[in-house]
């Protein structure tokens, strides 16, 4: 009963956050939108900001991870990890995220429960020019809405700068980067990522990324790489799949993720 109540409370919280974001957005979409651009693919975020009046849902409906540490194997499935994005003002978007529902198996122990949520914003800092990369800032907080096993039980801040060098590259190529800091229970980690993309066709893209986490105070560095594909089914709908492996022991050994994104109105 307690678990059902907790899930119900999380649903109410999520619905409330989404309603607030919708009310805060402009009533009419402005301008003809470009093809959908999401933060779904790989670990880092896109530097693109949603146009005013548009609402975008990005859902990782299935994620699976395997790891082995101290001869103890673990399997972790995450369902419906979602991000809700609102084009609030020109060069500014509001965001709410839910980190998903977990099913975890470690050794002979099983556990399940909801993850925390997120409130954040993305703002344009620099426009692309001949001398500088397009750069945005993504900053926010995690909200402790999850079950104890999957929550920090605190409000944790984070931020990342997202410089993109895509406009310096040939038309079919892209390069986005992420440099920032996240906190978890007062422990800070420096996080980085660099994503390289190639447009196979007008609707299909391939991406590869190196990423990592370096504790600022103490702990072990974690580094990995991943790769994946996006398929723009329509101008406002995208499917994606990506997978990754660790480059050192502290990182997750292997993971795979599949997602769906839609922007409204079209």
Regions found by a protein language model. Give the residues of each.
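Cleavable N-terminal export/targeting peptides
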Residues: 1-38, 266
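Transmembrane beta-barrel domains of Gram-negative outer membranes and organellar outer membranes
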Residues: 29-266
